[in-house]
């Protein structure tokens, strides 16, 4: 009897480096190491009390059975209502919405339904690790496209034009961006939308961090594009309401694509957890309480960001100033012939010698950098940043 051999479906699949980094930190802490985990990509705040209370009421009322694959109608209706308030074109309706088990599933549904063998899809790089793997699982080819550092690594139509070929079928956008925290302006998004429309590309807009911005708004593509004909917008409650474990996201897309994605989901997870859908409905149905909870969280993130940036700049550490999300993207060193992934080496040494867990930039296809999350208690963030500075200075020497 032979052992397990992976199928050809997953032979090239790489596990999520962000999840792996956090799991490693948790394992070391469980073994007694005083590890500071700055690798996690989730808010360190509790789910708002009003959401918890409504979830409890829904549970008592029997919200424990299957729902439609697309999700409960009241939740889809309020998502559509909120999207329509943003959209500059036609009204968004509930039959354009699918509620998913987190935004990750919504993105996978879209990639798997839109792209296939021979298709190329451009991914802003550095970019979230799962974009590349989802496209590969869909048999499409992810094309890493890099922007200039002076633009916070954001892309322009010129960048896209240089990377595109006759096989290009789409583009993934993420603003605010994971891992850099960069936010695209309205003008920047308008230029990209026009460029993509001229070429009949699909745009997948990942807007999960949109509510977490510090220096002005993070525009939704819904407020830029006049039509949703070749647009998929993905969002959820995980980051803006500290509801990562509830696993609720959604997609907004053309009806024909939505039907295809619903068929796909009917054979994978079916509906997202019923209780979680009711919790998400509570979060979206109480705008005043929701705005207060999100504003309080964002205010604390901003204070942490500012304090950490002050320390890093005083030490002359190269860092991209985040305008949104909750990550610091820090230069670990320059790649050389001997050291091709300085970010990976630095992250390993940081954990082994200084008990600080971060995510190496190789996870985001930029091996000279590391991602540091400040979605952790303030004292942990500040002590972790001090250790990063200490390690960086000693490594350079």
Label every model-predicted segment.
Residues 1-6, 11-16, 21, 26-35, ...:
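PLP-dependent class I/II
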């Amino acid at each position: 009897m032979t052992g397990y051999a992976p199928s050809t479906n997953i032979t090239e699949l790489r596990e999520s480096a962000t999840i792996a980094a956090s799991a490693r930190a948790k394992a070391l802490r469980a073994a007694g190491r005083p590890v500071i985990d700055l690798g996690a990509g989730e808010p360190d705040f509790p789910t708002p009390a009003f959401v918890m209370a409504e979830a409890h009421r829904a549970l008592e009322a029997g919200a424990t059975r299957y729902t439609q694959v697309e999700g409960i109608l009241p939740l889809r209706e309020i998502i559509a209502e909120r999207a329509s308030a943003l959209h500059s074109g036609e009204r968004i309706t509930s039959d354009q919405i699918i509620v998913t088990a987190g935004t990750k599933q919504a993105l996978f549904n879209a990639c798997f339904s839109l792209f296939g063998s021979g298709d190329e899809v451009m991914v802003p790089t550095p970019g979230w690790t799962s974009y590349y793997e989802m496209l590969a699982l869909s048999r499409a080819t992810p094309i890493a496209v890099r922007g200039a550092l002076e633009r916070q690594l954001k892309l322009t139509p010129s960048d896209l034009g240089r990377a595109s070929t006759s096989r290009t079928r789409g583009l993934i956008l993420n603003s605010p961006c994971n891992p850099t925290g960069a936010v695209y302006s309205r003008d920047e998004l308008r230029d990209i939308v026009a460029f993509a429309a001229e070429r009949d590309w699909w745009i997948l807009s990942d807007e999960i961090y949109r509510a977490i911005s510090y220096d002005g708004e993070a525009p939704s593509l819904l407020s830029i594009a006049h039509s949703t004909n070749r647009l998929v917008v993905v969002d959820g409650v995980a980051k803006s309401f500290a509801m990562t474990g509830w696993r609720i996201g959604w997609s907004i897309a053309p009806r024909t694509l939505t039907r295809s994605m619903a068929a796909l989901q009917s054979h994978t997870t079916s509906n997202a957890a019923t209780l979680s859908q009711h919790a998400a409905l509570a979060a979206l149905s109480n705008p005043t309480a929701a705005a207060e909870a999100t504003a309080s969280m964002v205010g604390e993130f901003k204070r942490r960001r500012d304090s950490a940036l002050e320390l890093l700049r005083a030490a002359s550490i190269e860092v991209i100033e985040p305008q949104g999300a909750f990550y610091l993207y820090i230069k670990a060193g320059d790649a050389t012939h001997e050291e091709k992934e300085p970010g990976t080496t630095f992250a390993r040494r940081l954990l082994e010698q200084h008990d600080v867990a971060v995510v190496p930039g190789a996870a985001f296809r930029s091996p000279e950098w590391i991602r540091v999350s400040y979605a952790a208690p303030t004292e942990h963030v500040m002590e972790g940043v001090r250790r990063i500075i200490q390690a960086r200075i000693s490594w350079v020497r």
